[in-house]
Amino acid sequence: MHKHIRKAAVLGSGVMGSGIAAHLANIGIPVLLLDIVPNDLTKEEEKKGLTKDSSEVRSRLSRQAMKKLLKQKPAPLTSAKNTSYITPGNLEDDAEKLKEADWIIEVVVENLEVKKKIFALVDEHRKTGSIVSSNTSGISVQEMAEGRSDDFKAHFLGTHFFNPARYLKLLEIIPIKETDPDILKFMTAFGENVLGKGVVTAKDTPNFIANRIGTYGLLVTVQEMLKGGYQVGEVDSITGPLIGRPKSATFRTLDVVGLDTFAHVARNVYDKADGDEKEVFRIPSFMNDMLEKGWIGSKAGQGFYKKEGKTIYELDPVTLTYGERTKMKSPALEAAKQAKGTKAKMKALIYSDDRAGRLLWNITSQTLLYSAELLGEIADDIHAIDQAMKWGFGWELGPFEMWDAIGLKQSAEKLEQLGADMPGWIKEMLDKGNETFYIKENGTVFYYDRGEYRAVKENKKRIHLQALKETKGVIAKNSGASLIDLGDDVALLEFHSKSNAIGLDIIQMIHKGLEETERNYKGLVIGNQGKNFCVGANLAMILMEVQDDNFLEVDFVIRRFQETMMKIKYSAKPVVAAPFGMTLGGGTEACLPAARIQAASEAYMGLVESGVGLIPGGGGNKELYINHLRRGHDPMNAAMKTFETIAMAKVSASAQEAREMNILKETDQISVNQDHLLYDAKQLAASLYDTGWRPPVKEKVKVPGETGYAALLLGAEQMKLSGYISEHDFKIAKKLAYVIAGGKVPFGTEVDEEYLLEIEREAFLSLSGEAKSQARMQHMLVKGKPLRN
């Protein structure tokens, strides 16, 4: 099937609809955003002399939604410029335009009859073969298609995005009986490769997979809290990062989602369930009281938590009053925290017989049993359920992975002792001697499915570094980095220091990696699969050395860092950097000299050293300045833009924004699906080699010199006089201005790169000896945020 989605239409411009439209715009798909025609004029429209027939009025809702996209946090758009891909309109005047769309997505109110009316309109105006989908979070997709044409049904399915659409990975696809299998296959591939999502196929049941299990787990947690007399803060102490869940844990998650939204999702199942399941999905009375009071969470200013000034209070579910935050106090909990890794932490706590252990057991065991009971009803296999929970709710471990972590056999024995009913398929599994849901052989992961283990089907674009290292081994390794054979004659330099911070160990491994690549490989990728690409240089090491007055050691490290970055730039084989997540300071400097950057769409890049009292010390000043020159800026303008970006420690909110900041060059590329990042980078490195890559020829750099230095200082002085920056900020700015301007040389002087690196290194060393800079470094290491002194 050679289908293409060149244009889309989103019907419904609320938070979810506009968010989906924004995500499509982010990847360059033109989208028509339609909503209903308002009944009345606003006062502002009346003042303008508009009438109900004015197009501005008739398309008001979608126009307003577009304006809100520019103000929302977190930002739905990867760049404000992407609004140019969105065309606002309304469902009456612009219905004819639906025939232009290859994909039409309904995102209106969760009401079956309203949705059916919308789809009748769509069926009338769509072109034959266009894909139509609903973003419903739990209404029957099959029922929505009743009465529609055969071609409509063949091209219809559910596409449930999680909010916010840009950031949350999960896309549940729900086919109906009549959905063409080729359409399901196409949308699955499109969802992963183009939209960048983690796609699972779900059954057409209430709340599908993630919301069904997630809502159950949250309600079970609330019920166990009430039964055991626990406090909100105590519960959140153990249901967050300790067990591989987001920091928001249980009740902060409910505040963010909104209790009103959560209650609606719970009622989807409650209305269709019976027996014990129905009772679990009944909203507890105290939560109904909260709904009546409007205490629905963050958007109302209070929910399970309330912030007054800088103090956060938590709700007592019994008295409905707010008090000081609580934390679980438990010897078993403290012992579990010392265990290494989420799996070990869970196992250490869940079998302990104290308040923390009992709570975790009661919550987890019920959720695991429920997940097992739903197999076949909500999804065909355990892997789909696990992936849905990880991608949709941010769990580190899916239910069946969690079960493996705590020990299936041990937990089953305890459940039987407590009189719980084990699902028949699990009893059968254990009787056959199979004690884990997942096994790994020769780097391939298998999952248990109907009496046998089946290999997890992987997109070839997903590279799992751990599995790769287990099968291919490691070429070289030290404490900070490893050199790995990535396949297809491309090597990978992986950072694995704490926070992937760059120290001498990583610098040495980059040297070794470049030498090995020049001998035996087509190219080198610099990348990893940590939480973030790199948060910067090893600040603790720098601070320790300067506090010991060991400036020679710091000079040596910075010199080696600069030399290594130059070696990357002029490598005989192409080097591709693959940044993602936080890519700050030295992390950005490690990318700038690469032949190409293959960035994840969610790459947050910037030279932020001023926040710790320093300036970039690995050639970042020079490379960013050169990038501006290459975009056609004259030396003065290029210096101004470089200075502003570094002095203000600007960080891009996306890879697209990094390109607009000239951190990425026009030739650099972006991967929407971060799971494909290393594959894309590998392909790019091999392609550069195969098409005759040659390293750049060294050229001199034209600088603005003394004239530029004076202009940069003038701006900094004005900021100081206006109270925007401190005296120490100004001192940093002076050093930075000197480096970017190229020192005290005439305007337009052409200097070599080594000279610029020398004055950069001198400025870095000078600032590192300043007491206030050291205070900033110390503050960042201890508090994790910048000190303005």
Curated annotation (Swiss-Prot):
Per the record, the pathway is: Lipid metabolism; fatty acid beta-oxidation
State the reactions this protein catalyses: a (3S)-3-hydroxyacyl-CoA + NAD(+) = a 3-oxoacyl-CoA + NADH + H(+)
* Disulfide pairings: none
Q: Looking at the record's lineage, which domain of life comes first?
A: Bacteria
Q: Does the keyword Nucleotide-binding apply?
A: no
Enzyme Commission code: 1.1.1.35
The keyword Lipid metabolism belongs to this UniProt entry's keyword annotation: yes
* Group of enzyme by EC: oxidoreductase
Query: What triggers or suppresses the expression of this protein?
Result: Repressed by FadR in the absence of LCFAs (fatty acids of 14-20 carbon atoms). When LCFAs are present in the medium, they are converted to long-chain acyl-CoAs, which antagonize FadR as to its binding to fadR boxes on target DNA and thus derepress transcription.
| GO molecular function terms noted in the UniProt entry | 3-hydroxyacyl-CoA dehydrogenase activity; NAD+ binding; oxidoreductase activity
A UniProt-annotated Pfam family = ECH_1
Q: Name one GO biological process term.
A: fatty acid beta-oxidation
Question: Which keywords describe this protein according to UniProt?
Answer: Fatty acid metabolism, Lipid degradation, Lipid metabolism, NAD, Oxidoreductase
The record's function comment reads: Involved in the degradation of long-chain fatty acids.
Similarity remark: Belongs to the 3-hydroxyacyl-CoA dehydrogenase family.
Q: What is this protein called?
A: Probable 3-hydroxyacyl-CoA dehydrogenase
